[in-house]
């Protein structure tokens, strides 16, 4: 996951935004406590969504605690769900996914990026090992995705559906694990599968120019020969992304969301469409690094 699953702040109630921030801050705190203070740098909106959704469908007690930001002690924070199982799972999935993303950067990145990736690799490897010991099922799902993706990318002309399949299957598997019965498994599998496709496609579109310049794999590159093709591709991608987003949202609507529904609705109905418009039709490259 790559930081695209965001809220649309202007459309949230103030209390909902404060709650979202408290989940985001709690995930940051959990990463630091469970792995390392430096693990906080892999904090992302995607896993904030995962934590909110997991806590939203489970009946675990959720506490709100006041504290101070580790990076800015002058800043007061509220932490939601720190220490509960769902938050720990979100943190573990964060470090496991970050580790395999780092391996991908080493394989495909530029020289400068490869050197930086090699330097931090031992830290990521240690965090991943610890997370994998606690949640081997997450390690298995993400590892399988990474291997499958590597095989798929050997064929530069592979179909876009085939290229998105590893990410889609991984997220379907991970989301399934949050279910408590067979019906929920089907719902969360569909939700995760189509959200995984959306994430893969939006990332591929966002990286299109960079991949073209660096000679990296991108399933959309074969469709571009001139500027007109580029504009037509954006329209096509918009349709593909809309389909994946709608199918994931349809599955989400079948889930029994017990809390944070306003936030989760905002992500699906406002946040994802905003990110999609920004990546496809906005100016410049999408920025996923802005902190709350």
Regions from the PLM with identified roles:
Residues 1-173, 177-190, 201-234, 238-240, ...:
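Acidic catalytic motifs of isoprenoid enzymes
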Residues 265-270:
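A glycine-rich phosphate-binding loop feature that marks nucleotide/adenosyl-phosphate handling sites
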């Amino acid at each position: 996951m790559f930081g695209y699953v965001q809220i649309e702040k202007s459309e949230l109630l103030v209390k909902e935004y404060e709650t979202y921030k408290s989940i985001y801050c709690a995930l940051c705190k959990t990463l630091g406590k469970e792995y390392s203070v430096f693990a906080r740098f892999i904090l992302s909106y995607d896993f904030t969504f995962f934590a909110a959704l997991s806590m939203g469908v489970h009946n675990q007690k959720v506490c709100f605690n006041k504290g101070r930001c580790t990076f800015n002690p002058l800043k007061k924070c509220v932490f939601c769900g720190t220490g509960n199982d769902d938050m720990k799972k979100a943190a573990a999935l964060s470090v496991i996914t970050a580790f395999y993303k780092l391996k991908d950067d080493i394989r495909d990145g530029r020289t400068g990026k490869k050197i930086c990736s090699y330097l931090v690799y031992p830290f990521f490897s240690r965090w991943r090992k610890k997370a994998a010991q606690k949640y081997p099922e997450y390690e298995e799902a993400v590892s399988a995705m990474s291997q499958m993706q590597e095989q798929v990318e050997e064929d530069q002309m592979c179909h876009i559906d085939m290229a998105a399949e590893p990410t889609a299957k991984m997220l379907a598997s991970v989301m399934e694990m949050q279910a408590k019965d067979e019906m929920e498994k089907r719902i969360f599998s569909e939700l995760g599968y189509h959200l995984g496709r959306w994430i893969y496609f939006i990332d591929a579109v966002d990286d299109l120019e960079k991949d073209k310049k660096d000679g990296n794999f991108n399933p959309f590159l074969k469709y571009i020969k001139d500027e007109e093709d580029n504009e037509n591709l954006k329209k096509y991608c918009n349709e593909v992304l809309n389909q994946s987003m709608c199918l994931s949202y349809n599955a989400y609507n079948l889930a029994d969301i017990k809390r944070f529904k306003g936030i989760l609705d905002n992500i699906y109905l406002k946040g994802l469409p905003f990110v999609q418009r920004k990546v496809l039709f906005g100016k410049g490259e999408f920025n996923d690094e802005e902190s709350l």
